[in-house]
């Protein structure tokens, strides 16, 4: 019969890992594919069969109740290496690629009516996500709930008035239930290596940053 080569999938995967893992260090931006979603985070395949976790608090600045609010299985995304432990286990982050406060705020203007998603309902107000890395606060309401789509009026973008504060004041015009499928995020950074990332403006009283 004809000669054939018997390849061990495990051996190929092991060789791939041996060559790939040394290239992964904190700050490296890479491609990933979502494999499954858990309440605590999102598992992704980063190549060579390597599974890595993006913790829920590292997915975006705007808080979500479950990773399914941001991702879906088989979705291709970008991620950045946050840490690699002594066993080669890799933890990733995602929010650093979604733009700073100023970059996201620049997409909007005072007086605009835009779409958002209600992410949190508190006694002092309702947080509405405008982008994954930007949320605004509306007056308290007891007739809305987390997960609803909302039409909001941008009352003020605080940097126009007080650069030290990162606030967007909103008025909820309408809130309604709607099925939506997570879309590919808008990435402000898609490749390279990050040494640090600062979300807050230079003049902000509160420093929000990631050091890799």
Regions found by a protein language model. Name each.
Residues 1-38, 43-44:
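A generic tandem-repeat structural signature
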Residues 1-6, 31, 39, 76-89, ...:
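OB-fold/S1-family RNA-binding modules
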Residues 6-11, 66, 93-96, 100-103, ...:
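Secondary-structure junction/capping motif
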Residues 6-10, 43-47, 57, 91-95, ...:
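Short, acidic/hydrophobic/Gly-rich beta-strand patch recurrent on exposed beta strands
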Residues 12-18, 97-103, 175-182:
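Short, charged/polar, Gly/Pro-enriched secondary-structure boundary elements
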Residues 15-26, 51-73, 99-102, 134-149:
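A cross-kingdom feature marking solvent-exposed beta-strand/loop segments within repeated
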Residues 21, 31-33, 67-69, 80-81:
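A generic local secondary-structure boundary/capping motif
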Residues 26-50, 62, 78, 85, ...:
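Surface-exposed interaction/gating patches
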